[in-house]
């Protein structure tokens, strides 16, 4: 389907990718074919006129919480996880730049020889100048997930929508991989997610989105062209929003 260039439903969005999304069928690391495909999806959306920010997890390289459960100091583990997100951000920057676009990586922890510090006004300026901006190192603090970092950055840059890319095509009332009668929701309110105890994001991230009335869409990143379709207003996946919101 072709869309008019000016008919975007969302102008500025933040896309949250898990680190695992970069692995493909591998058990660890980054699959070049996968990251190049994802970069192509992002470029396609940018070419339609969207301002795009990204947050990428680090679970394909390191999970601090998992090793903390086995005895590693949690703060140290989380700091190592932050470094993993920087590795992924640099890999995505490289993939995007090879496709001819301008990209900036901004880190919540100081690593000046590698990427910029996160400064809100500078980040917004990058977006206004059509530079894809990748936010790395989460919030810069231990005990907070990259979901929390994504929600925080989306609010700070004034995003119209927070997109969480997963391997499932939305939110269900129960695990669709275990229950053939699982029901998918097209739209939910924040209160419905809480009352039904649905797993959308971690509690801190979800609270940030809810309190700032930030619309959140959960969708399957494996579908070709899905990002562009969402930006043009197609109802894909599950939208979580304030009950009376028009987003």
From Swiss-Prot:
Which transformation does this protein catalyse, written as a reaction?
UMP + ATP = UDP + ADP
Write out the residues that bind ATP.
16-19, 59, 63, 166, 172, 175
Q: What is its EC number?
A: 2.7.4.22
Cite the source lineage: Bacteria, Pseudomonadati, Pseudomonadota, Gammaproteobacteria, Lysobacterales
Alphabetized, the UniProt keywords read: ATP-binding, Cytoplasm, Kinase, Nucleotide-binding, Pyrimidine biosynthesis, Transferase
Q: What is this protein called?
A: Uridylate kinase
What are the recorded GO MF terms, alphabetically?
ATP binding; UMP kinase activity
Family from the record: Belongs to the UMP kinase family.
To which pathway does this protein belong? Pyrimidine metabolism; CTP biosynthesis via de novo pathway; UDP from UMP (UMPK route): step 1/1
* Pfam families in the cross-refs: AA_kinase
């Amino acid at each position: 389907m072709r869309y008019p260039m000016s008919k975007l439903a969302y102008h500025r969005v933040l896309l949250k990718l898990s680190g695992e999304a970069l692995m493909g069928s591998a058990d660890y690391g980054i699959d070049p074919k996968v990251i190049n495909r994802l970069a192509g999806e992002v470029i396609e959306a940018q070419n339609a006129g969207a301002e795009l920010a990204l947050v990428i997890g680090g679970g394909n390289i390191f999970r601090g919480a998992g090793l903390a459960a086995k005895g590693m100091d949690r703060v140290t583990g989380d700091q190592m996880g932050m470094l993993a997100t920087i590795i992924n951000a640099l890999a995505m920057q490289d993939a995007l730049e090879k496709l001819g676009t301008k990209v900036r990586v901004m880190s919540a922890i100081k690593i000046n020889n590698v990427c910029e510090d996160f400064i809100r006004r500078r980040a917004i300026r990058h977006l206004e100048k059509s530079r894809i901006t990748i936010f790395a190192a989460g919030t810069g603090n231990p005990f907070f997930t990259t979901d929390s970092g994504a929600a925080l950055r989306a609010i700070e840059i004034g995003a119209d929508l927070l997109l969480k890319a997963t391997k499932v095509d939305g939110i269900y009332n129960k695990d669709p991989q275990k229950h053939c009668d699982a029901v998918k929701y097209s739209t939910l309110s924040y209160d419905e997610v809480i009352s039904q105890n649905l797993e959308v994001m971690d509690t801190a991230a979800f609270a940030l989105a809810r309190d700032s009335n930030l619309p959140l869409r959960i969708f399957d990143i494996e579908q070709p062209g899905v990002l562009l379709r969402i930006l043009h207003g197609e109802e894909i996946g599950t939208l979580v929003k304030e009950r009376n919101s028009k987003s």
